[in-house]
Amino acid sequence: MIPKKCALCGKTKYRHVPGVGNPKAKLMLIGEAPGPQEDKLGKPFVGPAGQFLNKQLAAVGIDRKDVWITNVVKHRCIGPPDDKIIGKSLPLLKKEIKSIKPNLIVLLGDTAVKAVVDKNYSVSKDHGKIIKSGKFSYFVVHHPSAARRFKRIRKIFLSDFNKLATLSRALG
């Protein structure tokens, strides 16, 4: 059933799309918000960006079944989510992170980096880096949607995913 309003922000007719994957995952991936396919199917990263992400995970030896994948905002937004929606979504995301307890969190895109770590960080200057904040370590990469569409970003994304593969193997 698709709710008429989001319980958090009250602004959407789209469905709640929870995170999915291995609840004991050592690796967690966090994106921005569900797109049309995710809204339709009720699962994160199942549309074109998700298919691209799956291909890149497989290419570096990471099985999607072994990770937890979620979004900052749990419902589709038309355009980037605003600060108010992100602010109302963060408590649920923080609860999700505490529940999964990943060893490494991959932040997919600027919205995830700014919402989860700090507004002073950005994908353009911090991609491919590990950021330690609080109890967790974060690895910053471009969003797969941008990597799919822009050749320059795709090249950076693929390089960062090779680094992620090394980090992932170190997790065991």
Predicted ranges, named:
Residues 54-62:
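A short, N-terminal amphipathic alpha-helix
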Residues 33-34, 71-73:
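Short, small-residue-rich loop/turn micro-motifs
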Residues 16-20, 57-58, 95-96, 128-129:
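Short, flexible, glycine/charge-rich loop motifs used to bind or transfer phosphoryl groups or to couple energy/partner
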Residues 11, 64-65, 72-172:
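Glycine/proline-rich loop-helix segments at beta-alpha junctions forming the active-site rim
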Residues 1-48, 59, 134, 168, ...:
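Active-site and ligand/interface coordination hotspots across diverse enzymes
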Residues 44-52, 86-87:
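Glycine-rich anion/phosphate-binding loops
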